[in-house]
């Protein structure tokens, strides 16, 4: 189990990403636009740097929904490999079963 504080930190990051998503997208559009003047581009870069660091989606970490484990995460199921195996053995994942050949 991950510490509760780590889960809370990830939840806070997710909230910040959602809050600043439109603002970040607008600033990045100005920066990447070839029609933007150098002054406008530079102002957009400074404004982007002034935003909270955790508002960037790249700082988020995928975690298991049940345990909060950061490694061995399978995006399709939202679970870590360990919890996915346990759920599969209990028959809770439709269409998934232990391999046998």
Swiss-Prot record:
Quick check: keyword Ribosomal protein in the entry? yes
Swiss-Prot/TrEMBL keywords: Ribonucleoprotein, Ribosomal protein, RNA-binding, rRNA-binding
For the biological process aspect of GO, one term held by this record is: translation
* GO CC entries: cytoplasm; small ribosomal subunit
Q: Where on the tree of life does the source sit, at the highest rank?
A: Bacteria
Q: What does the record give under GO molecular function? A: rRNA binding; structural constituent of ribosome
* Pfam short name (any one): Ribosomal_S14
Q: What does this protein do?
A: Binds 16S rRNA, required for the assembly of 30S particles and may also be responsible for determining the conformation of the 16S rRNA at the A site.
Kindly state the subunit structure of this protein.
Part of the 30S ribosomal subunit. Contacts proteins S3 and S10.
**Entry's PANTHER family?**
30S RIBOSOMAL PROTEIN S14, SMALL RIBOSOMAL SUBUNIT PROTEIN US14M
State the family it belongs to: Belongs to the universal ribosomal protein uS14 family.
Entry's NCBIfam families? PRK08881.1 (NF006477)
Q: What is this protein called?
A: Small ribosomal subunit protein uS14
Organism, by scientific name, is Shewanella amazonensis (strain ATCC BAA-1098 / SB2B)
């Amino acid at each position: 189990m991950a510490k509760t504080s780590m889960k809370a930190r990830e939840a806070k990051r997710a909230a910040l990403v959602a809050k600043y998503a439109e603002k970040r997208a607008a600033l990045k559009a100005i920066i990447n636009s070839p029609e933007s003047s150098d002054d406008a581009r530079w102002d957009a870069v400074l404004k982007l740097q002034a935003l909270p660091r955790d508002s960037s989606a790249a700082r988020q970490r995928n975690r298991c929904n049940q345990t909060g484990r950061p490694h061995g995460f399978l995006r399709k199921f939202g679970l870590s490999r360990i919890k996915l195996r346990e759920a599969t053995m209990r028959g809770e994942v439709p269409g998934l079963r232990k391999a046998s050949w």
